[in-house]
Amino acid sequence: MRNYKSTSLADQVFDKLENDIIQGIYQRGELLTELKLVEQLGVSRTPIREALRRLEQERLIEDTGKGSRVLGITKEDLEDIMNIRQRIEGLAAYYAAKNITPDGLRELTHIVDLQEFYFSKHDKEHLRQVDDEFHDMICALSGRSVIADTLIPLMRKTRRYRRVAIDNWERTTRTMHEHHAIFEAIVSGNAELAEELATEHIVHSKRYLIEGEN
């Protein structure tokens, strides 16, 4: 944290704390104080105060008067998020198929190639990273800012659960097949099929994350 640039310090503190809460580094019920975070992160109170305010708006923490209590993501939150993703992510794939450019095609192809490479190596850590990139890229390729602005924060909040899913190789194998089918639909310009496949993918992910089905 000590080498962060001052112009984006509050944003970077927010990203750090948000990620640590979502990943479970800060546990639900844990109390965070400005002094504690100053000591841990090596920054002043001002960016920490701004980050805490934003985290409270995201309902990841709540102010107790003596500090900020971590709320994290509950099972009910996860279910709500996945239900929203189920209804919106198909639209992102639909518009990505409609609006994809040559540059976008190259970027998406690169991500899919990386997924296949890391899958062949059983490299779970890099698979987690490119899984995030695959979904983020579809949002970007949609060209619809409202869709991207809605989905990307929700996907960040489920990152911890999605990354745990990579440890289940059967589910990971199915995810690879689903991603490739979505990719093929997008690059072929079949918007309706891309929407259908992306929606099905989220349905399957929701069943695994919430109900434990592969």
Residue map of PLM features:
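Anionic, Ser/Thr-rich low-complexity intrinsically disordered regions
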Residues: 10, 172-176, 194, 204, ...
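Short linear motifs at protein or domain termini
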Residues: 1-94, 98, 140, 206, ...
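Short, flexible turn/loop "capping" segments at secondary-structure junctions
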Residues: 30, 62-63, 131, 174-176
